[in-house]
Amino acid sequence: MRSHTLTSLVLLAHAMVTSGQQEAIPRSIKDVRVLSPDWICAVVDPTEEILAARQAQFGLDLAEDKKSFEDDQAAGKSNWYYAFSKTYRTLVEQKAYHQPLFAKFNETEFWKVNGASPADVTVWAHALDSLPGMDAGDIPTCDTSNFFRTADMVYLKLPGSLKDGESVEVKGADGRAGSLTFQDESTPCWSIKVNQSAYASDAKKKAAYLGMWLPGIGALDFKAFEGKSFYLKKFEKGARWDKGTAVGEPVFTGQIKLRKKFTDQDVKREGGSNLTGEDVYEMDFSAFQGEGTYCIQIPGLGRSWPFQVTKDGYGSAFYTMMKGLYIQRCGTELKKPFTAWERPACHTDTKQGQFIPETNNWYTTKYRQGAENQASVGFRDASGQRIGLSQFTLIGNSSPDSPAMPGVSGGWHDAADFDRRIYHYGVIWDLLAAAEAFPANFNDGQLNIPESGNGIPDILDEAAWGVDVWKKTQRSDGAVSSWIEQESHPGSSANSLAKSFLENQMQMFAATPDRTGSFAYAQAASWLGRLLAPYSPERSKEYIESARRAYAWAKDEDHAMKGREFPIVNAMRDPKLKGTTIRFDEDPKLTEQDPGYVAAAFAAANLYFATKDGSYLQDWEASGMGKTYSHIAHGISPSMCMPLLLNEGLPPEDVETMKKSLIEAADKLVGSQDGYAYRMLWLAPDEGWFHAMGWGNVYSKARTLAVAYAVTKDPKYKTAMENAADFFLGCNPTGTTTITGIGSVYPVVLQHIHSMSDGIPDP
């Protein structure tokens, strides 16, 4: 049976399932959660039901299609139909089975709570990931992104308020059931939001929050708790992540206070919105200075997720995030005792590619225009018209017979794939800035990485891993590449990490070196070399000398990329370019709008600090960066400024200009933070820019505060950073941490091929 027959049979087949085979479809409630004395949430995962219904209707057809697929594969033929067959049939079943089910969930008559109908009900489909494949040998979860898997969050208003010790049984009309027993000391309340990792014992502000928004309902009403007591109690861990209890007498008692009504959180910018939809209450325990593992406990609501209060505060989160960098390492074996997520070395073979690096957004933006729209630089077609194209078009035209680059491996894999690129220098700037500003916080052996024990602080070893991949690309003339990429994003059509990650790897190619990438390398290598001097003088000299050579090559305007021509043979992403020859030119003059201008100036400053060679100071002064910084600061990582503000030697007026600009930005963030109910670190609510919060931008604001604190030691910046960390670690509307592996509730589904392919639910 082929797909054109499906539509006519859907209703008949579905009637057969719902009448004659209903008992074969599994139905359950995965969890019942407390939100308030009056509201609970029944969590339904309909995945098994949808797949069972799909099998009942289309099992024979899918088996036939799969056999045809396997036969064609064995015969060396292409067969695209099987994937479309599964996609179509699954989507049909999601609509035919799940949509009516979802509608039923939204009816009070469908549910019974302790035998009575709930007072109200509302449902939210919470996206989880994708539906699994047909069987263990089939296409894995990461290749079924068309099949959205959801959890139906069924919010039920109880007929009467919960009492301590009361059991609640939830039943659906189709037989699904779940239950809980509410206990003040041990039942988690999902409306209490805390930093689920650790608060610093000396933090000026330590707070938890209370609030919840429900679809179709709005802000849950916690007014009855305003002015009531909350208790900070020792926490005793249970057998599971969601088990445990508050024990003993309170170590701190405080009052629940209203922080912001939802009506005070409307913003008019960007179409208008409400920031949380919640009436947010605050529980301040800043005066508590003890250490240990605790939870917030509120009579009538339950307890929060556990957290620690420790002297080092955010040290545990720092360790976990740094371990994430280690796990992202490319070109090396990952093994115990450094990680439980083991794998052999990967991507150890790199060849010289014939493609332009992405150092100036060449592939996506129109750069400068010449007369009559004839582009003076960038990519141009045969007529001279400026064009944009996919980077994979040029990378795919790199020859597999290109020269090998022995030993070129390393760096960190990008977010979901395996490239290493110039943007990764941002990580290096952050690591070096932290090590420069707060050296007492970092030592050898604290991160449990292979380099631990070599006498060098681990944070510098990790930074060196990011620098070394580019150092290995350095040519004899000093030029350095800044991008290593494959001809396309890696596939994930295998069902295991070994196959998708290690077997049949596409060839890695390194981009043509350019001036901007070489300047960026010179900045990083000279900075790293200087910080390594107390621990390894020889390595220090090696990095600094390598930086000198890269800088000297990049400074020569004759090394600008000019007159490059690229015959396009493979052009799957840009079919109109196939068979043509495109041209590329780079302007040798660097202006304020060029990333190379910034990279050159900061490289000169760092080389001056590392060598005390006055020629680099002259280059810094000639760049005019001290005067232009405030105009282009929005495009410069504040971390890059750390050495310039903490080391002597630059013109005082330049340093003062940069310092003033950064302090003004930091003060603005401190001022706007208190305008948010959960003390999020962002621009002021009336400024908007909420659309730009994706891709980690909301995290990056903390860099400004870190530099301001390092330079001034004003505790207000430290407090603002701690508030921001609390937000990321669970003090937010969703009540989840934003970092895998930290806290009780954290992301497990993310765009990360390793995790999607290794068969382990926890990333």
Predicted regions and their residues:
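Acidic, glycine-anchored loop motifs typical of Ca2+
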Residues: 448-455, 459
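Solenoid-like repeat scaffolds
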Residues: 624-630
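Short Trp-Ser/Thr-centered turn/loop motifs at beta-strand boundaries
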Residues: 175-180, 301-310
